[in-house]
């Protein structure tokens, strides 16, 4: 197998977060920006190729508590843990659903917060 094929296989096995780190490392190492070439390459492409740059551009997400579900007390506890709010503020947030629990967080953080809240029975959206 040639070096190029080996590198291609290694890149295929990376997660999305690892690929983002790789792109950032390339940008820093070689003093280039991946934004312009991606936009130029995506312009003539159709469908899926055009959707990829749109996903890459969104780096901040809001976690919205839609409904606390049946285990409201447990949801309040998790909201306190996630936000650092006091008991009253957390209860007000949960009672006022739908409301944002956390805003402008990374996708990984948003997914982790969503998982914690869903684990205790809440309904959550990521926007």
From Swiss-Prot:
Provide one Gene Ontology cellular component: cytosolic large ribosomal subunit
Keyword Ribosomal protein assigned to the entry: answer is: yes
Name the domain of life this protein comes from. Answer: Bacteria
One GO MF term attached to the UniProt entry: mRNA binding
Q: Which UniProt keywords apply?
A: Ribonucleoprotein, Ribosomal protein
Q: Where is the signal peptide?
A: none
Kindly list the biological process annotations in GO that this record carries. Answer: translation
Q: Which family does it belong to?
A: Belongs to the bacterial ribosomal protein bL12 family.
Q: What does this protein do?
A: Forms part of the ribosomal stalk which helps the ribosome interact with GTP-bound translation factors. Is thus essential for accurate translation.
* Quaternary structure, from the entry: Homodimer. Part of the ribosomal stalk of the 50S ribosomal subunit. Forms a multimeric L10(L12)X complex, where L10 forms an elongated spine to which 2 to 4 L12 dimers bind in a sequential fashion. Binds GTP-bound translation factors.
Q: What is this protein called?
A: Large ribosomal subunit protein bL12
Q: Which organism is it from?
A: Carboxydothermus hydrogenoformans (strain ATCC BAA-161 / DSM 6008 / Z-2901)
Gene (name only): rplL
């Amino acid at each position: 197998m040639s070096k190029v094929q080996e590198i291609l296989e290694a890149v295929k096995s990376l997660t999305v977060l690892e690929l983002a780190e790789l792109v950032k490392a390339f940008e820093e190492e070689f003093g280039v920006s991946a934004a312009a070439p991606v936009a130029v390459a995506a312009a003539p492409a159709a469908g899926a190729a055009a959707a990829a740059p749109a996903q890459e551009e969104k780096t901040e997400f809001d976690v919205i508590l839609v409904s606390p579900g049946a285990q409201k007390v447990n949801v309040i506890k998790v909201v306190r843990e996630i936000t650092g709010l006091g008991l009253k503020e957390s209860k007000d947030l949960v009672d006022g659903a739908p409301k944002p629990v956390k805003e402008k967080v990374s996708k990984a953080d948003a997914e982790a917060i969503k998982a914690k809240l869903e684990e205790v029975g809440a309904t959550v959206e990521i926007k």
